[in-house]
Amino acid sequence: MSRNQQLFDRAQQTIPGGVNSPVRAFRSVGGTPRFITCAEGAYMWDADGQRYIDYIGSWGPMIVGHAHPDVVRAVQETAAHSFSFGAPTEAEIDMAEEICKLVPSIEQVRLVSSGTEATMSALRLARGFTGRDLIIKFEGCYHGHADSLLVKAGSGLLTFADTTQNAPSSAGVPADVTRHTMVLEYNNVAQLEEAFAQHRGEIAAVIVEVVAGNMNLVRASDAFLKAMRELCTRDGAVLIFDEVMTGFRVALGGAQSHYGITPDMTCLGKVIGGGMPAAAFGGRRDIMAKLAPLGGVYQAGTLSGNPLAVAAGLTTLRLIQAPGFYDKLTAQTRKLADGLSEAARAAGVPFAADAIGGMFGIYFRDGVPGSFAEVTKSDTARFNRFFHAMLDNGVYLAPSAFEAGFVSACHDDAILQATLDAARKAFAA
């Protein structure tokens, strides 16, 4: 029995499903989860000593690669002065100033510890600011596991939940909790316009993944985002971009800088923690002024602005500002996507791939999908076989057909070539 299997058997005795986040259990692809012992650069090693080229990157944060010496040093130096204070630090100000500088739509920002906290708090603030209750979200977009957002959500819920019904995607969420959440089709402008026409003056906020990375990778159309911005402005609703995944991953200024659309609020995470638990929400000063202790919208957190997370995140944010960083990252990610498409074409396998910044999506279907409905038509059985063939050849992809992949600054040409060599074998199998 492998060491990975031994650990999985042991974990299931004390941890539900043997994992602390569902997709890690390999339920959708089958087989034994890999228990990771260490990682460096673009590589990870499991409990059996197997090395993998890593395309999960901790689900996005490791944009400069695992265990970057500057990030490690910053955390070690900070840890020597204690791990947490429960009081303000100067480093929190440095982090806030850096975020506001890099994302101009954010005039003020509040640090939290997870993406779920960021989106949950942003929606509460939007409701408090507008005095309205109704929220619009979109099919396949995942905004964390707050109750009101678990309706036709993406990420692991595409594997575990019934997504055919306009009802909570998780047991334990009362239907009454989600009655103020309206779910519309991603990239459907007409449906969005109709919703605003029917609910004029009732909509508190629209929240959207500008590049949806939790139903694989689906880009918002320019027309969709433009209409969203115009409708929110006209009706006084708050436009929230969930950039927990895309922030500093798609571009230095996030997906909003790539598209040239300015939201009222932005949620960030992943990269801003450099691998540590950290997230943030921020936006217009007049909206943020409603947040406690200035206003009546309450939000708090014992570990918000944690010194270790801030040290890792701030160092990462400074590293990614190096000249040419995003040009190279984008080029390498595109090279990977194009190489995978060519390998599939040569093997006669229906397949498509897309890439934006340091994110990529692979789809076992003809053509890149533009909506939740199109994503669900992918050949998941074929993906599962491909996933295991790649794993056997030392390439670690997301263990789900509905998750985006991530490239780091450490994925050089030799690593991409090794990946494509493995893919050619996998497609031919």
Swiss-Prot record:
The catalysed reaction is: (S)-4-amino-5-oxopentanoate = 5-aminolevulinate
Q: In which pathway does it act?
A: Porphyrin-containing compound metabolism; protoporphyrin-IX biosynthesis; 5-aminolevulinate from L-glutamyl-tRNA(Glu): step 2/2
Please give the GO cellular component terms listed in this UniProt entry.
cytoplasm
Organism's domain of life?
Bacteria
Q: Primary place of residence? A: cytoplasm
Q: Which residues does the record list as N6-(pyridoxal phosphate)lysine (modified residue)?
A: K270
Q: Which SUPFAM superfamilies match?
A: PLP-dependent transferases
According to UniProt, the name of this protein is Glutamate-1-semialdehyde 2,1-aminomutase
Q: Which organism is it from?
A: Cupriavidus pinatubonensis (strain JMP 134 / LMG 1197) (Cupriavidus necator (strain JMP 134))
